[in-house]
Swiss-Prot record:
It catalyses: di-trans,octa-cis-undecaprenyl diphospho-N-acetyl-alpha-D-muramoyl-L-alanyl-D-glutamyl-meso-2,6-diaminopimeloyl-D-alanyl-D-alanine + UDP-N-acetyl-alpha-D-glucosamine = di-trans,octa-cis-undecaprenyl diphospho-[N-acetyl-alpha-D-glucosaminyl-(1->4)]-N-acetyl-alpha-D-muramoyl-L-alanyl-D-glutamyl-meso-2,6-diaminopimeloyl-D-alanyl-D-alanine + UDP + H(+). Its EC number is 2.4.1.227. The keyword Disulfide bond does not apply. Cell wall formation. Catalyzes the transfer of a GlcNAc subunit on undecaprenyl-pyrophosphoryl-MurNAc-pentapeptide (lipid intermediate I) to form undecaprenyl-pyrophosphoryl-MurNAc-(pentapeptide)GlcNAc (lipid intermediate II). This is UDP-N-acetylglucosamine--N-acetylmuramyl-(pentapeptide) pyrophosphoryl-undecaprenol N-acetylglucosamine transferase. It is an enzyme of class 2 (transferase). GO terms for cellular component: plasma membrane. PANTHER family: GLYCOSYLTRANSFERASE (PTHR21015:SF22), UDP-N-ACETYLGLUCOSAMINE--N-ACETYLMURAMYL-(PENTAPEPTIDE) PYROPHOSPHORYL-UNDECAPRENOL N-ACETYLGLUCOSAMINE TRANSFERASE 1 (PTHR21015). One of its GO terms (molecular function) is UDP-N-acetyl-D-glucosamine:N-acetylmuramoyl-L-alanyl-D-glutamyl-meso-2,6-diaminopimelyl-D-alanyl-D-alanine-diphosphoundecaprenol 4-beta-N-acetylglucosaminlytransferase activity. It comes from Syntrophomonas wolfei subsp. wolfei (strain DSM 2245B / Goettingen). GO terms for biological process: carbohydrate metabolic process; cell division; cell wall organization; lipid glycosylation; peptidoglycan biosynthetic process; regulation of cell shape. Pathway: Cell wall biogenesis; peptidoglycan biosynthesis. It is found in: Cell membrane. Keywords: Cell cycle, Cell division, Cell membrane, Cell shape, Cell wall biogenesis/degradation, Glycosyltransferase, Membrane, Peptidoglycan synthesis, Transferase.
Length: 367
């Protein structure tokens, strides 16, 4: 069978797509898969590393900061749609699968005009405009949150959860601690801001990190590539070499599952992909929802877990070094509650999500 998979811009759209691709290959033995992304998205680096055939179309997300910028983004759509049309016409997939991000809209939309079956996966409790529109045309809409269903006027729909990478299931805590050169008996904090980093989290960390240098804890801090050099320079100026040993600084981690498995607590955004991986590993978190996410979906994702006592939450505009320092220390000093959070987070994991998604995808040609 032949599949086109599309999803990009951020890791939250890419990694579920890679999980589906890997699952299809495992189920079918042989599957011809073409991944469609953009040259500027993270997928251009991540997907080829996964060994998948990769091609691109020319499209960018809608910039809502002004009508002029939004108009410029929309002008590109006809071109990207016809690029998508040509790709589908040439490749002739049996099924087109979209996992979100602006690149998936023209690909899946074009797919609905061909004999190919089409399926989308919506990750968030509040669907974006693209998937709301696609839902009316595709053969199947798969959901991570049941709360998304009222927004999706799809022919067929199912709540499956979000597929996570196979590495998440295979990673071991003790082995990860050893690989990363961490001390096995120290409290470990992992801090990251999504695949592109997060300015607010990075700034709060810069304000707080010196206060942790003499404490019995270790930190894995993934800054995002754009902020890495500046943060590294500041730390070198403010912390002596001996004091920096408690801190591991990375611009990006392709093996982030090892950092998550090694950690006792995470500080991060509240994207659906991130939350699904944390849930599988039972890793509690202090969530700082991205304030400009469409429909404010990250805060809604975070509040759902906050109500279940699986996470703590700090609104982005209220996060600073002092708040972060106090939040982390409160949880460090209350291991009983931290373990309760971990148990509650693990209850939210849906380890069978990928199999449910594959079952739907592979029965589509028969319908």
């Amino acid at each position: 069978m032949k599949f086109i998979i599309t999803g990009g811009g951020t890791g939250g759209h890419i990694y579920p797509a890679l999980a589906i691709a890997s699952g299809l290959k495992e189920r079918l033995g042989e599957a011809e898969i073409l991944y469609v992304g953009t040259k500027k998205g993270l997928e251009a680096n991540i997907v080829p590393r996964a060994g998948l055939r990769f091609t691109t179309i020319d499209i960018s997300g809608i910039d809502r900061s002004s009508m002029l910028k939004a108009s410029r983004s929309l002008v590109k759509f006809p071109r990207s749609f016809f690029q998508a049309w040509d790709i589908i016409k040439d490749f002739q997939p049996d099924i087109v699968i979209g996992t979100g991000g602006y690149v998936s809209f023209p690909i899946v939309m074009a797919g609905t005009f061909f004999p190919s079956k089409t399926v989308i996966h919506e990750q968030n409790a509040i669907p974006g405009l693209a998937n709301r529109n696609l839902a009316r045309r595709v053969d199947y809409a798969l959901l991570n949150f049941a709360e998304a269903a009222p927004y999706m006027k799809a022919k067929s729909m199912k709540v499956t959860g979000l597929p996570v990478r196979s590495e998440i299931f295979n990673v071991q805590r003790a082995e990860s601690i050893k690989k990363l050169g961490l001390e096995p008996n120290l409290f470990t904090l992992v801090v990251f801001g999504g695949s592109r980093g997060a300015m607010t989290i990075n700034q709060a960390m810069l304000e707080a990190v010196e206060r942790w240098q003499d404490s019995k804890m270790q930190i894995i801090w993934i800054t995002g590539e754009s902020s890495y050099n500046e943060i590294k320079q500041q730390l070198e100026e403010r912390l002596s070499l001996s004091k920096r040993r408690f801190l591991q600084l990375y611009p990006y981690m392709f093996n982030i599952e090892e950092a998550l498995a090694a950690a006792d607590l995470a500080v991060c955004r509240a994207g659906a992909g991130t939350l699904s991986e944390l849930a599988i590993l039972g890793l509690p978190a202090i969530l700082v929802p991205y304030p400009y996410a469409a429909e404010n979906h990250q805060e809604k994702n975070a509040r759902a877990l906050l109500a279940k006592k699986a996470v703590e939450m700090v609104i982005d505009e209220f996060l600073d070094g002092d708040t972060l320092y106090k939040k982390v220390n409160e949880l460090r000093e209350n291991p009983v509650y931290l373990k309760e959070m971990a148990r509650n987070m693990a209850k939210e994991g849906r380890p069978n999500a990928l199999n449910e998604i594959l079952d739907v995808i592979l029965t589509l040609p028969d319908n």
